[in-house]
Each structure stands twice: as structure tokens, then as C-alpha cells.
């Protein structure tokens, strides 16, 4: 009897679930593959969904829809449409999807998870704080962190050991962020897996794993309430990241002076205020956003560039020769812990266009984030082409599809750093997203990557441990990481 009732209710649920999907399939809707009850189109995706969705675009067009279980999801594979959504019609695409994993931990605080007017307020506060940041302080902190990185690499090279790019580049970006936000120095001997860095790094890695793999319970409407309770009661890693930020706030307040600006934390305290728990949570969530969005992406970018330098030694030598020529023409780098004429500064960037193009081409050829962070529609909307997108639809830009679009890139499947030398802009190249809700820390990230990359190339030649090209396969997640690899460092003379 009970079993029969359960089966009956389950069948009713399947029919209702199917009807809710199929009733939307009309001539005004976006094209897309036929969804099945409960799973929608999830069954059609492999462990490399950005490839699957790029393939689907060949059949369904530049913009189409799929169902991730119950979540109506729009896939955009065209830069013109992407700009229409994220720039021209921004207010209709300002929000994040209202799913448990986005709400969990911050309750929509900070710059990443906040919605609507709350996000606009956060963006204004954070933007004001960042504009007040002393640029000389930023340049000096990056120079100092590069000195530590290069010194560590010299120690490894002289010992004959292999270099682990993921470990040391993650430590570099973590240390730079610690200095930028907290004005704290991380010892060059500190292990990423132990000590203060580990307090933040370990829960951050778990957060990335959760967001990268996703959960069916996030996109099944019937399970969302229970899944949110599960996240709140039985998972702690996001709260560990938030609480780490709170601990730093209270520590800062012990010596805080409104007229003294030591770091970004001081500026956030001044702009947000700390009178209420909500203000404290906003600051902590913003700090967490900087670490979660800025550390792994920059470290992975550098790791991928090192991989491409090994696999394309001719470009590695071209970059090295350009840097040497620039330092000679500019009278050397000067300052810092490295000797004069043997250190690249941010001011040398204009004199090293190939290095900059190499960086850009790597981000095009190997996009760091396959879809970026999702958006959600605030209301029904008709696009310029007459197609309809319903309220609460999830929007994903397929950056892999954009980067391999033959309309915008000649020979897109070929790695060619010279493609950005003649043209600084390409509408399909948007590594930091576009529009008002693009990456708030993009300038810092580009400075950080350039200064580290150029000084590594200046000081070392990178080789694979077996003389063969490094496997370029990437593992899917919130960021697309290469498979771990080691490097032989050869000191430049």
C-alpha cells in the first residue's frame, strides 16, 4: 500500500516535472536539445561540458537553451550577444542564480554573490576603496613578492631539484593577496599546506571543488530547501573562509586609525563601517571574494603560461630576448632585491608587447574559467533577434566557444602569441568578462601576472623533466587546471 502510494506520487512528480519543461517549448523560445524529466539535459554532458556545449552550438546556434535538471539555462557562444546581455541589457542580467550553493555562507553578501541594488552598493564601496589604494604600495608589494618567488626558484635550480609550478605560483599569489589586503608578509619558508596559509587554502580548495563539480540538488527544485539546510548544518569550509576574514577584521580593528591607510582592509573598514554584524559580514565576504576569485585564477594562468613556454620553446626564447632588449633600452629595472638590469618592472610592460601578447594568447587558447560565474535574469526579456528568455533563467557565457570562433580568430585552434601584436582588442576576447559586473580585480591580476611572468622568463629557461611536451589536457572545474607537472629550471646567464 505505502509502496504503491510512493510510486504513484513519484509518477505524478515525473509528469509534473516533464510538463514544466515541455510547456516552455514554443516558437518564441530559444532552440535546444530535448530535455528528459528530472535530469533535463545533464545526461548529454560529459566531464568536459564546455566542449559539449560548443559542439551543441553547431546545431542550435549562437545562443540556445538546455535544462540542468530543472534550471533553465541559456548558453551564449557569440560575443555580440554576450555584450547585448551583459552590457546593453545589464540590469536584466545583474543577478546570480538563486540556488543553495550561492546563498550558503554569505546570504548574498560581498561582490560575487550579492544581487540587484545590494550588488550595486557593494560595487560602489569596493570600487571606492580600491581607487584609494596607493599604487606605489601595490607596485612595491608585487616587486617584493616577485623577489621571494625568484629567490625560491634560484634555490631549487641550484639544488638540482624540479620546480613545482602549482605549489610555488599559488604561494606567490596567496602571499601577494595577503600583503595587499592585510599588509602581512608570508615567510618564504612557510608551507602552503601548513601554517597561516593553510588556514585559508584548505577550505578554499574545498569551496572550489564544490562549485566546480556542482550538485544535482542545487538545480532540482524539489531538493533545494533540504540541500540548503544540509550545506548550513553539515559543511563548514565556506564558513571557515568567512570566519578567517572576520578574524582579520577584528585584529585590524585593534590598531585601526581612520586617517591611516595601511592596506585594502583598512579602506573596506572605513567604507563599510563595522557597527553591525551585517557590515562585518559584508567586509568578510568581500575579502573572501578577493581570495576565491583572485588567487587560484592568477596562479593557474601563470601555470598554464609556463606549460606553453615549455611546449613552444621558440616563443620562450622570443620573450626572453624581448625582455633583455627592453631592459637594455630602458636602462635596467633597478630597485628591489634583484640586481640592476636584471629585474622587470611594471613600467617595462609597454616595451615588451610580445610578452603581453603571449599572456593574452594563453588566456584565449586555454581559458581559465570555462563559463565564468553564472548570471540570472531578473524578468522576462526579448532579445534583439526576437528570441525570448524567461525570468530566473541561468545565463552562461561559453568562453571556450568564443575563443575558438573562426569569425573572430584566424586559425583559432593554433597557439599563436603574435595574433595580439597587431590588434590590442578583439570582441571575442573577454578573459575577465565584460560589463559592469566584470572582474573587479582584473587590473591587479594583470599586473601580478605580468611582473611574475616576465621576471621568471628573464631568470630561467623552463624545460620538461623528460624532454617531451607537457600534456596540455585540463581538468574541468571552476577553473580549468592542467594536469600537475614538474619543471626543470635552467638559470639564464
Swiss-Prot record:
* Pfam families given in the database record: p450
> What EC identifiers does the entry list?
1.14.-.-
GO CC terms: membrane
**The organism sits in which domain of life?**
Eukaryota
Alphabetized UniProt keyword annotations: Heme, Iron, Membrane, Metal-binding, Monooxygenase, Oxidoreductase, Transmembrane, Transmembrane helix
Q: Give the residue spans that cross the bilayer.
A: 1-21
Q: Which cofactor does it need?
A: heme
GO terms for molecular function, please?
heme binding; iron ion binding; monooxygenase activity; oxidoreductase activity, acting on paired donors, with incorporation or reduction of molecular oxygen
Q: State whether keyword Heme applies.
A: yes
| Annotated binding of heme, by residue | 439
What InterPro entries is this protein classified in?
Cyt_P450, Cyt_P450_CS, Cyt_P450_E_grp-I, Cyt_P450_sf
What is its subcellular localisation? Membrane
How this chain sits in the membrane, per its record, is: Single-pass membrane protein
Q: Does the keyword Protein transport apply?
A: no
Report the Gene3D superfamilies cross-referenced here. Answer: Cytochrome P450
What family does this chain come from, according to its entry? Belongs to the cytochrome P450 family.
The entry's protein name is Probable cytochrome P450 508A2
Q: What is the lineage of its organism?
A: Eukaryota, Amoebozoa, Evosea, Eumycetozoa, Dictyostelia
Amino acid at each position: 500500500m505505502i509502496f504503491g502510494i510512493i510510486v504513484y506520487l513519484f509518477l505524478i512528480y515525473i509528469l509534473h516535472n516533464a510538463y514544466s519543461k515541455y510547456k516552455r517549448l514554443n516558437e518564441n523560445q530559444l532552440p535546444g536539445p530535448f530535455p528528459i524529466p528530472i535530469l533535463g539535459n545533464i545526461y548529454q554532458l560529459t566531464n568536459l561540458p564546455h566542449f559539449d556545449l560548443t559542439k551543441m552550438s553547431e546545431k542550435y546556434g549562437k545562443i540556445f537553451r538546455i535544462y540542468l535538471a530543472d534550471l533553465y539555462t541559456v548558453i551564449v557562444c557569440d560575443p555580440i550577444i554576450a555584450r547585448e546581455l551583459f552590457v546593453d541589457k545589464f540590469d536584466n542580467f545583474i543577478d546570480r542564480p538563486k540556488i543553495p550553493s550561492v546563498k550558503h555562507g554569505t546570504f548574498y553578501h560581498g561582490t560575487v554573490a550579492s544581487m540587484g541594488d545590494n550588488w550595486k552598493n557593494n560595487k560602489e564601496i569596493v570600487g571606492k576603496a580600491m581607487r584609494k589604494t596607493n599604487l606605489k604600495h601595490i607596485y612595491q608589494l608585487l616587486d617584493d613578492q616577485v623577489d621571494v618567488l625568484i629567490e625560491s626558484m634560484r634555490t631549487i635550480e641550484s639544488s638540482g631539484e624540479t620546480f613545482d609550478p602549482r605549489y610555488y605560483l599559488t604561494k606567490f599569489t596567496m602571499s601577494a593577496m595577503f600583503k595587499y589586503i592585510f599588509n602581512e608578509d608570508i615567510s618564504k619558508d612557510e608551507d602552503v599546506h601548513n601554517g597561516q596559509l593553510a588556514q585559508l587554502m584548505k577550505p578554499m580548495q574545498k569551496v572550489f571543488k564544490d562549485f566546480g563539480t556542482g550538485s544535482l540538488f542545487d538545480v532540482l527544485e524539489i531538493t533545494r530547501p533540504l540541500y540548503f539546510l544540509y550545506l548550513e548544518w553539515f559543511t563548514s569550509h565556506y564558513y571557515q573562509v568567512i570566519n578567517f576574514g572576520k578574524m582579520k577584521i577584528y585584529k585590524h580593528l585593534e590598531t585601526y586609525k581612520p586617517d591611516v591607510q595601511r592596506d585594502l582592509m583598512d579602506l573596506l573598514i572605513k567604507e563599510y563601517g563595522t557597527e553591525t554584524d551585517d557590515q562585518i559580514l559584508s567586509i568578510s565576504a568581500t575579502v573572501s571574494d578577493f581570495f576565491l576569485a583572485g588567487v587560484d585564477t592568477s596562479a593557474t594562468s601563470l601555470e598554464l603560461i609556463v606549460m606553453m613556454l615549455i611546449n613552444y620553446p621558440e616563443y620562450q626564447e622570443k620573450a626572453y630576448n624581448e625582455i633583455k632588449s627592453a631592459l637594455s633600452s630602458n636602462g635596467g629595472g633597478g630597485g628591489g632585491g634583484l640586481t640592476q638590469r636584471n629585474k622587470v618592472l611594471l613600467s617595462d610592460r609597454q616595451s615588451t608587447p610580445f610578452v603581453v601578447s603571449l599572456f593574452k594568447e594563453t588566456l584565449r587558447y586555454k581559458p581559465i574559467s570555462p563559463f565564468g560565474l553564472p548570471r540570472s535574469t531578473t524578468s522576462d526579456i526579448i532579445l534583439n533577434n526576437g528570441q525570448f528568455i524567461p525570468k530566473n533563467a541561468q545565463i552562461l557565457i561559453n568562453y571556450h566557444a568564443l575563443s575558438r570562433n573562426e569569425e573572430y580568430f584566424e586559425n583559432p585552434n593554433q597557439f599563436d602569441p603574435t595574433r595580439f601584436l597587431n590588434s590590442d582588442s578583439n570582441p571575442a576576447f573577454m578573459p575577465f568578462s565584460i560589463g559592469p559586473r566584470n572582474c573587479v580585480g582584473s587590473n591587479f591580476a594583470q599586473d601580478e601576472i605580468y611582473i611574475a611572468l616576465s621576471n621568471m622568463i628573464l631568470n630561467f629557461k623552463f624545460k620538461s623533466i623528460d624532454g617531451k611536451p607537457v600534456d596540455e589536457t585540463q581538468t574541468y572545474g571552476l577553473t580549468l587546471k592542467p594536469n600537475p607537472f614538474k619543471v626543470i629550471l635552467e638559470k639564464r646567464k
